Structure formats: structure tokens, C-alpha cells
């Protein structure tokens, strides 16, 4: 049957041979009667069809209207996001660059962090606001006295401080030696009932541990909670410049133990530098490392694990196969060997601090030829396994072949090709340009230090530029002079399609200025905000552009330290360029830097813990960048920076990354980039950036097309003319005139 009916034809019959009777259910019809019914039935069917078409049209209209309303909601949401972004940046322009966004009313950075995991909100529920970078003042304690001032405390007081530190999710991550020094360097402070210990909005640079008494925490007059003995408060202030986000008042007479930021930084930096230098010194004595570059030895030092063995423990047993190398950090080990024909193992020698054993195991499977036994009370060793060693060094055959050859040339580090020499200096045409020649056309962005304006030179609007104006007084107040000069010097040194060009710098009594290449496609962050997230193809293109820029910087021993979509600009061509080099720094080969700076959601664990960092911090940020492009938000994000740092220290493996947008291959790349140990991150090995390019996520990607700009970009921004700023948010004029600044720090800018 081609249809269905509630009736069916039961039978056909003929009474006289001419008339046919048809029985339908309980009724009988003659054929001609049924024939008369056909037009009526067809008309009824036609009416039903018309009704169905009408209903379908109504439904389609409703669907269309729903779609229109969804579009209006999306448009309104984007406008709200834009307005929120503008308002937040406007607020930041009057605040310290180190001040993070205000936390939610129910949280603060004064107490201990709650146990939590990073939870990704449902689609479309998150509010996208620009992320704010933070920075401590640049520090260098290498030439400062080796001793720190210690303050007397009772045994009970020291234990109370240690217990408070161990309960704090951030501070408990510090090394044992650092915690001991931190406790010794804290000094006593007392406050009477009713006295304010911390006031909201004031700059903060001290951490407190409550020893006795009770305090009340409030924000904007509303009580948030109380703090009692054994509580840590203000830990964000020992990391970088920030303003207090809440007030703390003593309810009773209180006793506090206090640590200044400068002392905390000196403790972490000095001990970290001493440990790193000591390991490098140990490694330089090992014959198979003798001809490695200082940079490569430094990376080996980064990946060495620290282990402790009690006295009497066999670290190695004769006859076992080994794949690890050991350096004695403290204590002693006894070397014994079983000699054929002798019942007892013969003692060969005692090894002390700085001695090493097992180095041949790094070159291949080695049968241990002796026992290594920890001596009482115990021994601390630094360990390097063959897998980590191979990733850093590359071709082991080179080491095997040249082992012990003092004349050997170091060929283990991949030498990138030198950048192509630029024939024409693009800055020459700006040699005679002064501020008087520059005309402002529109505002492209605002921030804590100043504004970025679209400008033209000598009234020629056919060519436009970006003028970055930075308030000198604000720079001095936040002690960022060194960072600003570093930005100028690094950008003057660079010349590549992957980095915005700096043409010239100026200064007057109120500002220092940078005349920059303009990218009228706008910030990648704005495009990401409006689209919600990017697919695999789009994200891969923008990650590849960043990778080209990072490789260029790393070849010059420059660490970028502020990768995020906000600092990626779209050129008219749709290709990406890095901008904002305020945190970039040029490092000596094999050396680290120690200043806490970056964007909270993007900083690596070693920056948070002030262990010293290098270019590997950029590879961590690259992993976070991939996540944000594909998920629409960074993977580590919480209600305040301190909680964000706690999530980061828990590691990428603790993340619950939703796979609805980011596939297994991209997730695998993120986890290889975001390893806790900097030396284990993809890109830090002997293959450098090429190891990242070879990852499966980039399989089939046209790298040559990217470099020659023949690869079609996924998004082509609409730019109508050189003065078109429609791809940027609208900003109100700035009527706030900063005071003059005459200290002279900008001489030669």
C-alpha cells in the first residue's frame, strides 16, 4: 500500500454482470457512486494541503523570527562586551598597571585559597573582558649582600608561621630552603583594636601572617569575613605591584609577622640563582658535557630532578641496567664492587657533594659496574634520565663518537639561519619627523600607561601610523623605566613581518612616544570575542604566525613574556603581528631573568614561584594561547589572580578541558607545551621551534605558504581606507592631563 486508511475495501461483486458493488466497511456502494465522491475527496485533500502549507509558513516565520532575535541578542552581547572592554580599559588608565581586575565580592587575595579546579562555563555564559598585564619592578640581587636580616622568634612562633605557610596553596610550593629563610626574615608588627592594617585601594608590598588576635575583612564597607591566628593575608603583594582589593581592621589587639616584597624576591631569586649556578658548576665537570654550550647545560640543569635517599639505601646495584645519571647535592655515598672470588663487596671509594656517577648510562643501556650506597644520615642527589637528556641534546651518536675529545666542536645545538640582512633601513624616512609633524586622527586603545592613537605625518592621510603615548609620571611611580627602555631597544633591533615595526620615538615633559606600524585589522582578541571561538583551521593559522614571531625573537635571545590575543594585531592582509614589548627582555646565553611580569592567566609556574625563567616561558604561554583561541577563554582563570596562580601551579593535567571544541591532537600539543618543568616543554629541546612545527596538530600545514604570504588567511579584515578604525572599539577622549616629569630618566629615549 502507498498510504493508509481507517477503511478498507472488503470485496467486489456484480449482481447482474453490469453493476459493480463495492463494500467499504459495513457499507456497500455502487461504482458510479464512488466515482462521484472522488472530486469531493480531492477538494478535501486540497483544503488540508492548504492548511498544512499555511501552518508550515507560520512555523517558518516563527523560526525566522527566533533566528533574528538570537542575532539581536548576539549583537547586543557584543556591544556589551565592547562597552565593558572600553570601560575597564578607561578605569585602568587611571590605575596602576600592576593592579589586577577586582575580584568578585565573595573572594579576596587576603586569605588562603580554596581547593578548586578550573571549570569551563557553558557556551556563551562567560563575559569576555580584556586581560590586564601585571609587573613587579625589575630586580637584580646579584650584587647585593649575601646575608638577609633575620629576626628573633620563639620556636613556637616559627612553627606557627611554618604551619600557616604550609596551609597556603601558593606559599607551600616554595622550596624547603626558601620557606626556612622566609620564616627567619619575617619581622613583628602589632596593631591596636580598631586600627587599620590594610586599606582598600592603597598600594601593597607586604605579606602578613596573623599570630594573635582577630581581624575583620571588608570591601566597600561590606564585611567579607574574619581572620584569626595562623592565617596568611596579602600574598599577591609580594609578587608584583598591586593595590589592595580589601580593607583589614583589627577587632582586637593583634600580633602579625610581616614579610616585605623586596625581601621575598631576594630570598627566592638568590636561592634559585645559587642552586642553578651550583648545578651548572657540577655539570661542567662531567666529561660528556664538557663541550656543550652554556645555554644547553643550563637547560640540562632545569630538567634535573631532586631525590633523597636515607642512609643505607642502595641507589644503584651492580649488574642492573641503568638509564640515569646522578650528581650528589649534599651528603655522601659509598661505592662498593663485588670482585670475583671475594665473598664481600669491596669498598672502592666515598663520593661527596659535587661528585657524580652513572654518566655513561645517558649514552645507552649500561650495566652498572658497582653499588652506590647512601651514607647516614642520608644523601640528596640530582637526577637526569636518558629520555630527558636525549630530548635536550638530540643526536647521541655525536657524543659517543667524540666522547673525551677536548678539541671537539659543539655541534649539538641547532643553529638557525641568520635573518636576512635588510638592504633599506625603513626608519630612514622618519629621521626628520618630529611631534609637530604628527596629527592625531582617532584612538585605537587605552591602558594604564596611556593611549594608542591613529596618526598621520605632515597631514598625509594616505599613510597612517600608531602613536603610543606613555605617561612619564606613571612610569616613574610604578618603577617601570627599565621595561620601557627595553621595549624601545628591542623593537628598534627587530625587523620582521611577524612583529609590528617601530619607526621612531619622541619625548616631552609629560609623555614618551613610540611611532609604530599600524594594523587596521584590529586586535585578534576583538575578533575572538565577536566570534566566540575559532575552529582548528583558524586557530592553527594564528598559532603559526605567533610561532614565526617567537622563533625570530628567541634567535636573538629575547623572551617575549606577554603573549595573548590582545597583543596580536591583524594586518590588512589578515596576517598576524606581535605588538607590545613592554615585558620583553634580551638574555645572555644560558641565563635567566627573575622579574615577575606577564598576564596572570598566561604566566608560567616558574614565574609565579620566582625560580627564574627564559624563553621556555613563551612556550607555556603558547599552549595557553592555543586553548584560548579554540575555547574562547584561557584554561586557567579564577575570580582573582591568586586563585588563578593556584590553578596554574596544580598543572595542566589537573584541568578538565572540554573536547567539544578542542580535539585530542590539539590537547596533546597544549600538554606538551605546558609542562611544569621548563626544560621538558616542546620547543625547549634540541629541535627548538621545529619540534612544535612537527607536531601532529600542524600536519599538512603550509609553512612555506605562510612565510611567503601566499597562504590564504582564514579571516580577511574589512579595511576601507588608511584611516578606517571600525575594527577597533570606540574610546572616549581623555581629558586627564598628567603632570610634568623632570627626573631625566628618559634621556636618550
Curated annotation (Swiss-Prot):
Encoding gene (name): egl-4
Post-translational modification remark: Autophosphorylated.
InterPro entries: AGC-kinase_C, cGMP_dep_kinase, cNMP-bd_CS, cNMP-bd_dom, cNMP-bd_dom_sf, Kinase-like_dom_sf, Prot_kinase_dom, Protein_kinase_ATP_BS
Species of provenance: Caenorhabditis briggsae
UniProt name for this protein: cGMP-dependent protein kinase egl-4
Disordered: annotated span: 87-111, 723-749
SMART domains referenced in this protein's UniProt entry, alphabetically: cNMP, S_TK_X, S_TKc
Lineage: Eukaryota, Metazoa, Ecdysozoa, Nematoda, Chromadorea
Keyword line: ATP-binding, cGMP, cGMP-binding, Chemotaxis, Coiled coil, Cytoplasm, Developmental protein, Kinase, Magnesium, Metal-binding, Nucleotide-binding, Nucleus, Repeat, Serine/threonine-protein kinase, Transferase
Places the protein is found: Cytoplasm; Nucleus
GO terms under cellular component: cytoplasm; nucleus
Family annotation (PROSITE patterns): AGC_KINASE_CTER (PS51285), CNMP_BINDING_1 (PS00888), CNMP_BINDING_2 (PS00889), CNMP_BINDING_3 (PS50042), PROTEIN_KINASE_ATP (PS00107), PROTEIN_KINASE_DOM (PS50011), PROTEIN_KINASE_ST (PS00108)
GO biological process: chemotaxis; receptor guanylyl cyclase signaling pathway
Superkingdom of the organism of origin: Eukaryota
Keyword Transferase set for record: yes
Catalysed reactions, semicolon-separated: L-seryl-[protein] + ATP = O-phospho-L-seryl-[protein] + ADP + H(+); L-threonyl-[protein] + ATP = O-phospho-L-threonyl-[protein] + ADP + H(+)
UniProt-annotated catalytic positions: 562
Keyword Nucleotidyltransferase attributed: no
Entries under PANTHER family matching the protein: CYCLIC NUCLEOTIDE-DEPENDENT PROTEIN KINASE, PTHR24353:SF111
